[in-house]
C-alpha cells in the first residue's frame, strides 16, 4: 500500500509523543497498523514491549489480525516466529482489558479477593448491586434532609426516580475522574453555590450580547429604508452602549436605560409593512427581558439552595460506598472498578516502575473517547516521549462514559520537543459532496457563541483524490424533525413521530430511485 506524505510521517516519526487528528476515511487504521508493524519489524521492538489500546474488542482483534498477516509475509526467522508466538498474549486490547490485567496481577495490593479480580459483573448484577446500594443510602441519610430534597424535586414535577437518575449521572462523572479529582470537582460545585460564578456571568453576558447584536443588525437594515429614523437611531445608540458593556452589571444598567428611553418597534412605518422585522426584533428583545436577572437576588437564591446540593452529594457518596460493598459481597468488579483499581495500583512505585520498564511504546486508538481517568492511567507509567495517540473529535461517541474530546484538543495545541501534533485531513473514502456536507454540518453543530469553537480548521476534512471529485455528486440531505411534547402517553407520541419520520424518508428514497439514483448510492443517517 502506498501512503501519502502525512500518513508516512505518522508511521515513521520517533522519539516524541505524537497525537494525530485523523478524519474519517483518512486511512487511520492502516497507518496505526503499519506503525505497529514497523515498530516490530524495523525497530525490532518486541511485541510484548508494546501496549496498543482501543475502545472495542473488535478493533483490537482486527489490529492483531492485520499484524499477524504482516508477520506471515516476512521470512520466517527466529525473531518473526517469536513475535507470532507472542502475539496471542500481546497487550493489544481495550483499555478496560488492560486495566483488568493490572488488577488481576496485583489484586492483593488493593486489597480484593482473587475471586473478585476474576469476575466481571454482568449488567444484571450491576443493576441489583446499585438498587440495593441506593436503598441502603436512603436509609442512612438524614430523613429531614432527604424530605427537603424530594420536595424540591417535586416542585419541578420530578419524582424520586428522577433523584436516582441524577445520582447515577453524578456517579458517571465521578467515575471518569481519579478519587482526588472527583473530590475537587464536588468541592468546586458546592462552592459555586456561595458566590456568583464568573464563568456563568460571562456566559450570561455573551447570551445577552448575541440578542443585542441581532437587534442592532435588524436596525441596520431598517434605518436606511425609513424617512423619519430618529427614534430608531436612538434605539441603535442605546444598543451600542449595551454591546460595549464589559460586565453583566454594566449591561443590565444600559439595557434598562434602553427600555426606559426608547419607543417600541412599530409594525408599520411610513405606511410600509415592517412586521417581519418587528416580529424578529421583538423576539430578541423579549429573550433579554425575560432572562435578565438581579445579581443580588440571584446570589441569595443560589445560596438558599446550597444545603440541597450538599444533601445530593452526601447521598451520592453514600450510594458510592454501599455500591462498592454490594459488589464486594457478590465478589465482582465492574468496568469502572477496573480503571479505578488500575490507577490506584499504578501509584505504587514498584508497579509503576515495572510498567514503565515493560512498555517501550504505547499506542492509543480512538483517543477522542478518552476520559480524564484513562488519560491519568497512561500518564502514570509512560515515558516522556513514547505515546502515539490517534483520533477524531467528530467521532466521539462515548459521552455516556464521560469521554472528553477536549483532552485530545489540548494535546493538538501542545507542540514542543516531546510532543508533535500531526494531521491526516484527506478523506479517501467519500465523494466530495459528502465531505463538504460533513465539514459544514459539524462546523454548525459543534460551534456556538456560548461554548466556543469545538470544530476548528484542523478538523476540516479535504477530498483525498481528484477521482472523488469526478464521481457523480449526489446531494446530502439533513432531515430534522421534532415532535410536540403534548399531554398523553409520551412513548406513543414518540413512536408515532418516528413512524411518520421513517415513512417520509422511505418515500423520499423511492422518489429518488424513480429519478434514476440507484439504491446503493443513497444513505440515510438517523
Regions found by a protein language model. Name each.
Residues 3-4, 11-12, 17-21, 51-52, ...:
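Conserved helicase NTPase motor core
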Residues 44-48, 72-89, 106-124, 134-149, ...:
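Short, polar/flexible loop-turn hinges at active-site or ligand-entry regions and domain interfaces
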Residues 46-60, 67, 90-92, 365, ...:
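Conserved RecA-like ASCE P-loop NTPase motor core of nucleic-acid helicases/translocases
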Residues 165-168, 423-514, 522:
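Helicase-core coupling region on the C-terminal RecA-like lobe
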Residues 31, 35, 62-70, 98-105, ...:
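Alpha-helical scaffold elements adjacent to nucleotide-binding pockets in ATP/GTP-utilizing enzyme cores
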Residues 1-111, 326-336, 350-353, 395:
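P-loop NTPase Walker
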Residues 49, 164-332, 503, 510:
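Conserved ATP-driven helicase/translocase motor core recognized via long
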Residues 26, 57-60, 69, 96-99, ...:
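Conserved nucleotide-binding/hydrolysis micro-motifs of P-loop NTPases
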